[in-house]
A protein has these predicted regions:
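Peripheral terminal appendages
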Residues: 121-196
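Active-site adenylate/phosphate-handling loop in enzymes that bind or generate adenylated species
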Residues: 5-89
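Alpha-helix N-cap and loop-to-helix initiation/capping positions
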Residues: 12, 16, 110-114, 149, ...
Length: 196
């Protein structure tokens, strides 16, 4: 399944997450029916219920069950259970959809997604695989979100970072003084929702 073949998703509207989940789970349910599977589950957890997750609407429309959320299991508890049972990704930081690195309305393409993934992977080699960080792309500018306590280290490594990220095709490099924030591209949307 190639989500970017869908023009409505590729042009990254504010409801992109809903459109994408609707498309993906539509295909998954079609596959499930073809193979005699009557129920599909997903990994939504309790924490997801308290943040902006427009894709959950598609899951409800399709009748997808979210057992972790239903049992009030949090992301921290999921990671603890994964570690207890030796699941290899137990200590990996969360990896949300790469489209969340782009502002709404910016066209999504594999070139920019690959460059973001490359840049984030490289930064993880510098700051640790478990470090929560994001590269947010605004045209030819990239904005690094990282924990405030790591910002001094970023400045110490800036020459190396400038060289690598410019090699990836980013012309302007900035660091977000607010630090890492999950869902920072949704802040304007959630502010709009709160004022309704």
């Amino acid at each position: 399944v190639d989500e970017l073949e869908q023009e409505a998703i590729r042009y990254n509207p504010e409801n992109r997450c809903y459109l994408c989940k609707h498309y993906l789970f539509g295909k998954l349910l079609e596959f499930a029916r073809d193979h005699g599977v009557t129920q599909v589950l997903d990994g939504t957890n309790e924490d997801d219920l308290h943040v902006y997750r427009p894709g959950r609407k598609a899951l409800r429309e399709y009748g997808v069950i979210s057992p972790l959320a239903a049992c009030h299991v949090t992301k921290t508890e999921v990671k603890a259970l994964a570690a207890k049972y030796g699941v290899s990704v137990a200590h990996r930081p969360s990896t949300p959809c790469m489209a969340t690195r782009l502002p709404y309305g910016a066209e999504i393409n594999y070139d920019v997604l690959d460059r973001i993934a490359d840049g984030e992977a490289w930064l993880h080699t510098m700051f640790g695989a478990e470090e929560n960080l994001r590269l947010r792309v605004h045209g030819d500018m990239v904005r690094l979100e990282i924990a405030p306590e790591r910002m001094g280290e970023v400045l110490e490594k800036r020459e190396e970072m400038i060289a690598y990220l410019k090699k990836l095709g980013f012309s302007y490099l900035t660091m977000d003084l607010e630090g890492f924030r999950s869902g920072s591209m949704d802040e304007k949307i959630t502010q709009k929702e709160e004022t309704k």
